[in-house]
Amino acid sequence: MRLARPLENLIDQLLKLPGIGPKTAQRLALYILKLPEMEARQLAQAIVDCRQKVFPCSRCGYLTDFDPCLICSDESRDKSLICIGEESSDVIAIERTGFRGQYFVLNKDFNLMEDKGLEDLNLKPLEDRLATGEIKEVVLALNPDMDGEVMSRFLATVAGSFGVKVTRLAHGLPVGGDIEFADEITLRRALEGRKEL
């Protein structure tokens, strides 16, 4: 069935978003069409505003609308502890845990298995912060996939060259998960990271 061209275009644009399949894109497009015109314009303007006014903090890379960001500007944070994540969404997730250190966000799509991404990383702000001697520990909070492993080793070498302690998030079984369904790597990491009770 043929759809109106503007509707097809909206669906095609929504399909470019992560996690949005054809049915969800169509459902969202039809929902947007039902919005009062003012709300539809506000949605469109919010997207334009984000593209124009949100940028990576020059100090940590977290997405912000002023520089330095609120996290870097917060004097109550532990400046001796820095957590390195892949994306701003990682910072948002870690912030929910009550983490009180600071951050560095890579903000790069890297596929190290295909030699893509390492040369594009801007690590100068991180190296400048490490060089001050104020940072005592770097926590690597990278995804537990092959690229995350390679990047973790690379960043551990970079941070280690400044004499700081380098740790990484523990890997293991999710809360509510069944051991029988866990893969060998997850189980091995859970065993290696076990703690005394």
UniProtKB/Swiss-Prot annotation:
InterPro entries: DNA_Rcmb_RecR, Hlx-hairpin-Hlx_DNA-bd_motif, Rcmb_RecR, Rcmb_RecR_Znf, TOPRIM_dom, TOPRIM_RecR
Domain Toprim, chain residue ranges per copy: 80-174
Matching Pfam families: RecR_C (PF21175), RecR_HhH (PF21176), RecR_ZnF (PF02132), Toprim_4 (PF13662)
Keyword terms of this UniProt record: DNA damage, DNA recombination, DNA repair, Metal-binding, Zinc, Zinc-finger
Gene3D superfamilies: 3.30.60.80, 3.40.1360.10, 6.10.250.240, RecR Domain 1
An annotated Gene Ontology molecular function: DNA binding
BP GO annotations: DNA recombination; DNA repair
Zinc finger (C4-type) boundaries: 57-72
Protein family according to the UniProt entry: Belongs to the RecR family.
Function: May play a role in DNA repair. It seems to be involved in an RecBC-independent recombinational process of DNA repair. It may act with RecF and RecO.
Protein's recorded name: Recombination protein RecR
Gene: recR
